[in-house]
Amino acid sequence: MNLFRLVPIFLLAAGTAFAQTPAASPADDSKPTPPQVNKSFDLSAMDKTADPCTDFYQYACGNWVKSNPIPADQVRWARSFSLLRERNRFLLWQELDAAAKDPKTPLQKQYGDFYAACMDTATVEEKGLAPIKPAWGEIADLPSAKQLPGLLSKLENIGTPDGFFEFGVDQDEKDSTQQIAEIYQGGLSLPDRDYYIVDSPRFKTIRAEYIEHKKKMFTLAGDTPEQAATEAAAVMEIETAMAKTSTSRTDLRQPENRYHIYTLVDFEKMTPAIDWNTYFHTIGIGHFDTLNVATPDFFKALNSMVQSEPIDSWKSYLRWHVLHGQAQELSKAFFDENFDFFGRTLQGQKEPEARWKQCSTMTDRALGEAVGQDWVKQNFPPEAKNSMDKLVAALEKSLGDDIKALPWMSDETKKAAEEKLSMIRNKIGYPEKWRDYSSVKVRRTDLIGNTHASAVYERDYNFAKLGKPVDEKEWGMTPPTVNAYYSPSFNDINFPAGILQPPFFDFKVDPAVNFGGIGVVIGHEMTHGFDDQGSKFDGKGDLREWQTPADRKAFTERTDCVAKEYDGFEAAPAHGDVAEQKLNGKLTLGENTADNGGLRIAYMALLDTLAAQGNSIDEKIDGYTEAQRYFIGFAQVWCQNQTEQSARQSALVDPHSPGKWRVNGSVQNFDAFGKAFGCKQGQPMYPVNSCRVW
């Protein structure tokens, strides 16, 4: 039911920050220890032998990159995000562990029991495959493809993953006050459609390994080798057919490509082989006459597949998606095989995360605002919110000044842009009103039952929005999250408490470092309101053109410059028969535009702040001017190491560029950087011709 929406737009890849790891490892003797968070500005992280005008990322981060290899349980390790995430997760673990042992409130008992059930590996092992047997029993009884929709609703009603497609309720992108039914493509287990349809040596190898993985999983579940091979082949055939008709991530970034309003009658006519009436009437959603079919071609193809694929193939497909979807919560044999392929093979991760880490993350995902209430009380001081309010106001002023000064934009469009900026809502720290999880029944000895209860709660919470006014105070992240996001349909920016601390935000450092850290994050999120996606939504959050045709043309010319520039950046090198992996400038365009704009407007805000204090951008601290400290502080946010496998996957699925290019790509488009470091025009970080949107 998790919709394949590319909004809200996150500072990092949504949901998992950097490490995309399984949910819980079955065996773990490690003891939690509090991680050391880095300073906001660290001279020891720098490689002073590097030329900042040639490779600023190496100059600002080189020593850190050299001295901080990727931990065995991670696929990407970042100086700021990863270490702060680990610190927040340690604090979260302290809260959960205490609640599991001695809960003081009903809320603590609920999330304490959820965490305890996850940590109870003995019970998980004892149950083995039993928790998914009821779902498999329903699948085995499926008489024909005509009854598929009824079966899907049964599986969803008990919280079991089933693949196929994604259905739920979200804002109407052309009337953001309304919430409508939406249906999206889905059904794939591999990270992206390219894994199924691109005929490169690398993808052919991955497909072969994926088939072997499925065979092993089916064998563990009781199939003979022959049965497992037949089932694995059937799943591969169906998923490949779905991949061939799936819309690309790049195309789905543009809202007009995913907005197709159908009457329910017309949708049923388009897909007559699928009994939507049964599905919609048995999953517990209210009445609706129209819906947004985000990917019509996918559903036309699915209709044909339902008619042509044998019923046994559909049974194998559904058995697989239940098994794959729950493998991380099953006994050790299933967990290990799942990790071996999706963690080790696909991403280069050497070992699973510690059990306590994964159970902390799982509990936060399932009961985030329950856990978050107590987390905020312990870890988010009121003065942090007050300081953020001031920083946000400073950045809003700078973006307004930037809009006024743009030479390529007409006065008519500037007025509309300023109006949209004035309407942005800021959410800082945590929700004003917490969710009520009292209907989620948690059992201390039933991990999968708890995940099912959470899934049903989230689905029903979403379905209840149908036809109701939008709740503008709702959050899309939990308080401990180290991330931030902008929502075009809400026209709001959201900064969870988790990111509002060192090294991003530090009361004790000079303004240059804070503006280079959290200031650029704020500017980044604001700029999303005016990137190639956000600029298509007005101040109310409606999908509506507010630029003149001439200004839209000028805007597109500038964003095309950025896309072409980032197309040339390397994500992973060539070796053997594996080709070089370049970034996708169109996929990453929104994030790159926001990085560039955020760097510029945060610098403008710093200049205003220093001037108001009677200080100069050229004053030195520890041998560096405030301008230089600003850029170094910004760069050190993005110091990172990443496995090659993860880097290649990210280049296909992640709209964010790697840290190196978030730094070098941004500074080379900002003349103030070249001047701050005395670069000569024509050097790599101070080119004669550069790209600028905002």
What would you call each of these model-derived segments?
Residues M1-V7:
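Bacterial N-terminal signal peptides that target proteins for export
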Residues V7-T16:
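Bacterial N-terminal signal peptides
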Residues A17-A19, A23-A27:
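Boundary at the C-terminal end of the N-terminal hydrophobic targeting segment
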Residues D28-S44:
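Short, Gly/Pro- and small/polar-rich lid/capping loops
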Residues P32-P34, V235, V265, K269-I274, ...:
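Intrinsically disordered, low-complexity linker/terminal regions across diverse proteins
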Residues P32-P35, A50-E126:
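Active-site-surrounding "flap" and adjacent substrate/cofactor-binding loops of secreted or lumenal enzymes
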Residues M46-K66, Y196, S200-T219, L589, ...:
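Hydrophobic/aromatic-rich, well-ordered segments within soluble, folded domains that form packed cores
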Residues D97-A394:
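Noncatalytic, helix-rich "gating/capping" subdomain that lines the substrate-entry/channel surface
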